[in-house]
């Protein structure tokens, strides 16, 4: 598989994602600038964290209109894996690829730390390498990570098993139902606030992110 790591003005986790999928996991990947209009030859998309366009208007709002977005939506419609972490998650909800919205943290402060998570659904294409109900630790670093959805959206997320990760032990940002990561109905688009790409080696504090990327490579190869 060949992955496109999308770069926006203000992205700052792009090299982390490239390193995780290419250098640690051994997949083919390269950077693609946000102004490109084609993703021909790519089999998946990774959207990094950071502060795209300086977070003006809303986090991810301007990036959702970038020239590359129609191609990302095309790949998503074709069933290819699309993964967004932190600002990437914000871009996915702003572009309509995932339901709900992300707003300022409940405490109105930027939160940066290692956070315990629960794997709510280990049958998704992004989590089959995790044990059911596994507790994992991943870094978080965001100021606008409070996930909000209306009652109808929440009911649908629960009914379809779209809630993939929840915050365990404590809720760092006030997200409804402790939601940390969700997928679309089709199961090929994942957005999450935590950073699995920063948890790829024990030397860096933990390697609980490896199984997410391993799941992607196992479940999407050949699709």
Curated annotation (Swiss-Prot):
GO molecular function, one term: glutaminase activity
PROSITE patterns in alphabetical order: GATASE_TYPE_1 (PS51273)
Active site residues per record: 86, 195, 197
SUPFAM superfamilies named among the record's database cross-references: Class I glutamine amidotransferase-like
Gene Ontology annotations of biological process type: 'de novo' IMP biosynthetic process
Start and end residues of each Glutamine amidotransferase type-1 domain: 2-223
Top-rank taxon: Bacteria
Pathway involvement of the protein, from the record: Purine metabolism; IMP biosynthesis via de novo pathway; 5-amino-1-(5-phospho-D-ribosyl)imidazole from N(2)-formyl-N(1)-(5-phospho-D-ribosyl)glycinamide: step 1/2
Gene3D superfamilies xref list: 3.40.50.880
Compartment list: Cytoplasm
One GO cellular component, as annotated: cytoplasm
Keyword vocabulary terms for this entry: ATP-binding, Cytoplasm, Glutamine amidotransferase, Hydrolase, Ligase, Nucleotide-binding, Purine biosynthesis
Entries under InterPro entries matching the protein: Class_I_gatase-like, PRibForGlyAmidine_synth_PurQ
Pfam families: GATase_5
Principal location class: cytoplasm
Function: Part of the phosphoribosylformylglycinamidine synthase complex involved in the purines biosynthetic pathway. Catalyzes the ATP-dependent conversion of formylglycinamide ribonucleotide (FGAR) and glutamine to yield formylglycinamidine ribonucleotide (FGAM) and glutamate. The FGAM synthase complex is composed of three subunits. PurQ produces an ammonia molecule by converting glutamine to glutamate. PurL transfers the ammonia molecule to FGAR to form FGAM in an ATP-dependent manner.
Subunit structure: Part of the FGAM synthase complex composed of 1 PurL, 1 PurQ and 2 PurS subunits.
Protein name: Phosphoribosylformylglycinamidine synthase subunit PurQ
Organism: Lactococcus lactis subsp. lactis (strain IL1403) (Streptococcus lactis)
Classification lineage: Bacteria, Bacillati, Bacillota, Bacilli, Lactobacillales
Gene name in the database record: purQ
């Amino acid at each position: 598989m060949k992955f496109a790591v999308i770069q926006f003005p203000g992205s700052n986790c792009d090299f982390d994602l490239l390193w995780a999928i290419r250098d640690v996991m051994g997949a083919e990947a390269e950077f693609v600038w946000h102004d490109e209009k084609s993703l021909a030859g790519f089999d998946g998309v990774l959207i990094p964290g950071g502060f795209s366009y300086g977070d003006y208007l809303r986090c991810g709002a301007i990036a959702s209109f970038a020239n590359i977005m129609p191609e990302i939506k095309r790949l998503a419609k074709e069933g290819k894996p699309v993964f967004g972490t932190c600002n990437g998650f914000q871009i996915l909800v702003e572009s309509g690829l995932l339901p709900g919205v992300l707003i300022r943290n409940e405490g109105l402060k930027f939160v940066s730390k290692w956070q315990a998570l629960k794997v709510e659904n280990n049958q998704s294409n992004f989590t089959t390498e995790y044990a059911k109900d596994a507790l994992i630790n991943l870094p978080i670093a965001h100021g606008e990570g409070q996930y909000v959805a209306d009652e109808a959206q929440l009911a649908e997320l629960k009914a379809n098993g779209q809630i993939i990760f929840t915050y365990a032990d404590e809720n760092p940002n006030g997200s409804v139902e402790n939601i940390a990561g969700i997928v679309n109905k089709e199961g090929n688009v994942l957005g999450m606030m935590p950073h699995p790409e920063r948890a790829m080696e024990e030397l860096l504090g933990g390697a609980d992110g490896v199984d997410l990327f391993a799941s992607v490579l196992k479940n999407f190869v050949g699709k």
